[in-house]
Amino acid sequence: MKACAYAKDLDYIDADINARIQDMRIVTKVSLSDEEAEFDGKSLTTEQMKVLLKYYETCQEPRRKEFLEMFFFAFHACGLRVVDVMTLQWSHINFDKKELRKIMIKTNKRHVIPLSEPAIRILRHWQEKRPDSKYVFNLVKEDLDLDNAEELYRCRNNATKCINQSLNVVGEQLGLDFSLSMHVARHTFAIVALNKGLSMTVVSRLLGHGSTDITEKVYAKFLPETLAAEVARISPELNQFVPTIQ
């Protein structure tokens, strides 16, 4: 795999071909069950997201601002898990196709995510900051061995703890009654997507869930807006068949 990446750097093989070869890499699956803990309803409302964005724009602490950029990237990258934000490489990004192609650490499956303009803007910003880096975000060492499960698990825990501690301070300053974390970005994306009418199947694929059963179990009970909207949409048809009650 390293030889293919080197060949790509020397323009011996096409970047798309290299990306597909890298997708074939078999890694030891890391136990990350705690990362997909039962959803407890902690997500940000539209107004809270606006307040958080305003906080970011006025933040004077460089590292905290970087963590907020990672939070917003995870949100705009279809709820990308923190471990995949942490291990995201420039080789996973195709700016021309506006997509992210990566083997997800938790599922060990190839996943393709369409990149929105906000996500691309964040990536371009980090590309300017770290033009010669392997990893997009400065959360792990450049020589991190993704095939070393223990090292990956340790790095994931350290990075998550560091980011979430900083985000939690932000949440407290904004008056949130729960801990702000990277996983909140994932849940917020899912809730927004479902309430905007995306099907459970589509959202499940974007989140990288193994099946829609997982998505339904976690999110279905938090979707009264979507259910009400769907009923309202078909009401004109249903109302044709109302019996006259005497």
Where are these regions (language model features)?
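N-terminal DNA-binding recognition helix of tyrosine site-specific recombinases/integrases
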Residues: 1-22
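Basic, Lys/Arg- and aromatic-enriched nucleic-acid-binding interface segment
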Residues: 15-82, 86
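C-terminal catalytic core of Y-nucleophile DNA break-rejoin enzymes
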Residues: 38-42, 107-125, 133-169
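C-terminal catalytic core of tyrosine-transesterase DNA break-rejoin enzymes
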Residues: 72, 76, 80, 186-210
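Short, polar N-cap/turn motifs at the start of nucleic acid-interacting alpha helices
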Residues: 92-99, 177-178, 198-218, 246
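Catalytic-site neighborhood detector that most strongly recognizes the C-terminal catalytic loop/helix
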Residues: 104, 142-143, 207-233
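DNA/chromatin major-groove-contacting recognition/catalytic segments
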Residues: 114, 121, 126, 221-246
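C-terminal secondary-structure termini that scaffold catalytic or DNA-interacting sites
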Residues: 131, 139-150, 232-246
